[in-house]
Structures are given as structure tokens and as C-alpha cells.
Amino acid sequence: MTVPEIISDGKSTRRNLQKLLFFGATSATLAIAALTSRSIATRKYIPTFFQLNTKIPTFSSKSEAQAALGLSSGLSLGIFAITTTGFCWALDISSASDFKQRMKTLFNTIDEKEYMNDSDPETNKIIEELEALINKK
């Protein structure tokens, strides 16, 4: 197996994992959104033909508040998860340290050489092999 094959294989595996995390967060958020919509629809009071529409049915405000808090928290966390996983997938960020390094380079607080030296030993070995191949030509 050559160096480019190793790099492309590892990258495709990582990007597939990021894609699955993104789609998992999206499907969970859509499920919570459907649950929220169904919950709102069941709470809607529609009187029958001979019932008064001015008489409000009894309900527990405590359970209503708990349900609203739980559903809104679920939607907020879901949107946050979609945003985070989508951002990491689009920018090919695989870990928190990778994110930190990318933000430092974005704001010009880290040198490019320092960014490259902070990677793992396996990556350094692959980089050295690539540089040797390039310099050989």
C-alpha cells in the first residue's frame, strides 16, 4: 500500500464517520421536531358541536411546563449538534485539538510549521515520506 492510498483510506473513513454523525444528529432533531409538532397538535382544544368554546379544559401547568422545557431543550441541542457536526464535516475537523489548531491558524496566532509539528507521529512519518518522494523527482 502506497502513502497516497493510506492517506485517502484514512481520510475517507474519517469523513464517512463525520457524515454519519451529521445525519444521526439530523435524524434525531427531526424526530424531536415531529414529537414537538404532535405534542402541540394534541394540546389544541377543539370542542364538539354542542360544547361551549369558552370553557377551557383542565390541565396541569406543571406537566405542560416540563414537556415544553424538555421538547425545546431537545430541539436546541439537536440544532447545536447539526451545526457542530456539519461544521466539522465541511472543514474536515476530526478532533478538539484539530479544531484548536485550525482556529489558531485562522486567527494567525500559530505558525504553519508549528501546526505541522503538533500532529501525531504517524502523520509526521507520512509527511516525511511524501517530502522524500517530492524531492526525489
From Swiss-Prot:
The SS bond pairs are: none
Where primarily located?
membrane
- Superkingdom of origin organism: Eukaryota
Q: In its keyword annotation, does this UniProt entry include Transmembrane?
A: yes
Q: Where does the sequence pass through the membrane?
A: 20-42, 69-91
The UniProt keyword set, sorted, is: Membrane, Transmembrane, Transmembrane helix
InterPro entries xref list:
AIM11
Location in the cell: Membrane
The membrane topology noted for this protein in its Swiss-Prot or TrEMBL record is:
Multi-pass membrane protein
- The answer to whether keyword DNA damage applies is no
Q: Which GO terms describe its cellular component?
A: membrane; mitochondrion
The family note in this entry says: Belongs to the AIM11 family.
- Name of the featured protein: Altered inheritance of mitochondria protein 11
Annotated organism of origin: Candida glabrata (strain ATCC 2001 / BCRC 20586 / JCM 3761 / NBRC 0622 / NRRL Y-65 / CBS 138) (Yeast)
Q: What is the lineage of its organism?
A: Eukaryota, Fungi, Dikarya, Ascomycota, Saccharomycotina
